[in-house]
């Protein structure tokens, strides 16, 4: 059978080609989304369960997917020898870097306003005076462009409502959080 100049055969090979095409398109969509935005702004897993199961010690070196950095920081509570946080999306690593810079340079109240509430009226000052110097050049560039996510006044416009997870939250939560 001919369609638009291509030879098309019915049966199993056609099913495999369609499945392959769907997989290809799925990967293209994933790559387009994942390579252009912060996907995870918080983690939903329970790393305490992992810590209990792994029984990490000071002799351990672990490899984790960075995601939003929450699990990486939780594993650090066990003080393993080294943690390697990797992610295909460098924006996730930029978020972990920002959190580490905050842990090192901010008091609890400022850190919690940033990452507990997702906003801080003085973010630009804190970023310029304290946080930025501890970031890689990629993370600096990323947060130079996206730091406004932490400067919003409206509860629906906090850091947690930006990036891909934030878009999903906006779409699924009809009412603003209080």
Feature-to-residue mapping (PLM):
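N-terminal, positively charged/glycine-rich alpha-helical extensions of SAM-dependent methyltransferases
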Residues: 2-32
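Conserved SAM-binding loop of SAM-dependent methyltransferases across substrates and taxa
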Residues: 68-80
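Conserved acidic E/D residue at the C-terminus of a beta-strand in Rossmann-like folds
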Residues: 85-90
